[in-house]
């Protein structure tokens, strides 16, 4: 449930161009504390580009990003401190152990006192026994778990996860979803990009559906059902909305 009057994540008029290609165009949405929002869309819809702009890995061509009440352009350190980000493809430091990764993240965010919490997170994700393993020796699934664990070390106000469930075993996926719900219930804003529509339907309080760089629909499941007459499930509505979306015009 949405418990905050002021959104903790605000995207306003976001554009991102790569040469003549407009990957994201005039994107505006917000995520308030106490809700999980799913960012959905087919391949090439602009989801990852949007999340990378939020995480400061890409600089927007135009528009504004505010995280935890801080403008990412004018107050970048404060904005980044409020954010926990998990990329689509985890890339841990090869020569750091699992435990050293968490200690590094805790130090970077001034959360050295949270190592008891870090231990609990590793145990929930079945990484505690691997805490001495180097990043280079981890499997793909373990790298994904490590990236997720690092996101929970400091008490972020905004969580931004790009396809976090890919590569996780069933127990790991279940634990991560429960941890996201717990973060929401504690008042955080959670944005999750996923292609797993059945998971999004069960996990998310709202969804934002993108296609060709723009939002084509957003709302709760009840709101989508009221506006989208085609389809009883999120998957059916998603396919209908993305098929009807206008073709993107590449600027000359």
Question: Where do the protein language model's features map onto the residues?
Answer:
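Conserved ABC transporter NBD signature motif
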Residues: 63-71, 78-79
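Conserved ABC ATPase "signature" region
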Residues: 103, 107-130
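Hydrophobic anchor residue at the start of the ABC signature
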Residues: 148
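Catalytic Walker B motif of ABC-type/P-loop ATPase nucleotide-binding domains
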Residues: 159-163
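A short, surface-exposed alpha-helical micro-motif characterized by mixed small hydrophobic
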Residues: 200-202
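ABC ATPase "signature
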Residues: 218-219
């Amino acid at each position: 449930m949405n418990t905050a009057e002021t959104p903790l994540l605000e995207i306003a008029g976001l554009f991102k161009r790569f040469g003549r290609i407009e990957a994201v165009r005039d994107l505006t949405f917000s995520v308030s504390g106490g809700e999980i929002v799913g960012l959905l869309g087919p391949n090439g819809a602009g989801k990852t580009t949007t999340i990378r702009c939020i995480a400061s890995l890409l600089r927007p061509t135009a528009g504004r990003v505010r995280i935890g009440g801080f403008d990412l352009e004018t107050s970048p350190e404060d904005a980044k401190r409020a954010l926990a980000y998990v990329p689509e493809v985890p890339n841990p430091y090869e020569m750091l152990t699992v435990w050293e990764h968490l200690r590094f993240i805790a130090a970077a965010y001034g959360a050295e006192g949270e190592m008891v919490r870090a231990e609990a997170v590793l145990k929930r994700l079945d990484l505690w026994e691997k805490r001495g393993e180097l990043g280079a020796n981890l499997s793909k699934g373990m790298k994904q778990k490590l990236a997720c664990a690092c996101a929970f070390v400091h008490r972020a106000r905004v969580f931004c996860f790009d396809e976090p469930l890919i590569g996780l075993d069933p127990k790991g996926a279940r634990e991560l979803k429960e941890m996201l719900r717990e973060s929401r219930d504690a008042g955080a804003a959670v944005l999750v990009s996923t292609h797993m529509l059945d998971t999004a339907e069960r996990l998310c309080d709202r969804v934002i559906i993108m296609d060709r760089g723009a939002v084509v629909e957003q709302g709760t499941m009840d709101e989508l059902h009221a506006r989208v007459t085609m389809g009883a499930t999120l998957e059916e509505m998603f396919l209908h909305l993305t098929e009807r979306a206008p073709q993107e015009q590449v600027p000359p």
